[in-house]
Amino acid sequence: MKYEDLGVVPIINACGTVTRLGGAPLHTAALAAYDSAAQHSVAIEELQIAVSQQLSQWLDCEAGLIASGAAAALTLGTAAILAGSDLARMEALPDTTQFPNEILIACDQRSGYDHAVRAAGAKLVAVGMNEVVSGAGVRRVEPWEYAAAITDQTAGILYVQTDCSRPILADVIRVAQEHGLPVLVDAAGEIPPVENLKRLVDSGADLVAFSGGKAMRGPQATGLLLGTRTLVGSALLQMLDMDDHPQLWTAPAEFFAADEVGGMPRHGIGRGFKVSKESIMAVMTALEKFLGPQQATLMNVW
C-alpha cells in the first residue's frame, strides 16, 4: 500500500526533521535491518541487554535502552527516578502521593514537551525567573535558585538542553550532586553534532534522552535513554512485558545486584512505550552509521 491509496499526497519537506512531517528519510541500512529483524523472533529483554552493552561501548555510557521515542524515554527516565528499584513504587506510578515526586525545572525551560515527565507522576516545580523575557533586566535562572527550591519532596531535576539553555548544564549538575539528586536531560533534538552524544553522557547527568529519528535517521518513533546502570535498569523493568513466571525470572544482572530487586515487577507504567525488535535493530543500525566517518559531510549538509 502507498500513501496515495489512502488519499494522502506526499509533500516536499523543506522544514527539517520535525515529527509532524514524518521526520527524516529512514536510512537505507536501517530499513534493511528492520526487514531482516522481522524474519525472526528474539527475547526482547535479552535484546535490550545486548543493546545496552553495545551503547556502552559506542558512547562510553554505563547503560542504555531503546524506547518508542524521546518523549517515551523522558517518561521512562522519570519513572526510574521516582521508583528506583522499589517494586511498590513501580506498581504505584503514576500515583506518587506516598513518596518524593517533585522534579525541578528552570521556569524558562517549561514547555508542552514536559508533559512526558508529568505523565509518570512527577510534579514539576518551576525554578527562578527570566528577567530578559519580562523586560525587567538581564538575568535568567541561576544555580542557587535550584538549591533554594530543594525540599524533602524533591526527587530530581529535569534539564532541557539547547545551545541557549541557562544555567549551563554543568552548574545544574553540580547543585544536584551536592544534594544527591539525579539529573534527567532532554536532548531530543541535540544531534548533530555527533559529539553531543558523548558530551552529554560524560557531563555527569544521570540520564539523557535523545531521539532515534531526526538526524540519526532511525525510525521516527524511537528514542535512546542513556545513563547510569540502575536507573536505566529501572526504566527497562517498567517497560518490558513481564508476563513471565516469577519463579523463573531474575532481575538482569547487567543492571542490578543480586538482592537489589525484591521480586518480579508487574507490568509497569512504561508498558505503553514498548518498542519492536525491528525498530530496535533499525535504530541501532542508524546509530552505527551516524557514528561513522562521514560526520564532516553530514555537518556541512546540516
Task: Pin down the residues of each PLM region.
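Internal helical hairpin/lid segments
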Residues: A286-W302
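A glycine-/small-polar-enriched, mobile loop at the entrance of the PLP active site in fold-type I
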Residues: I12-A50
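Conserved PLP-enzyme active-site core in the AAT-like
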Residues: K2-P25, S52-F290
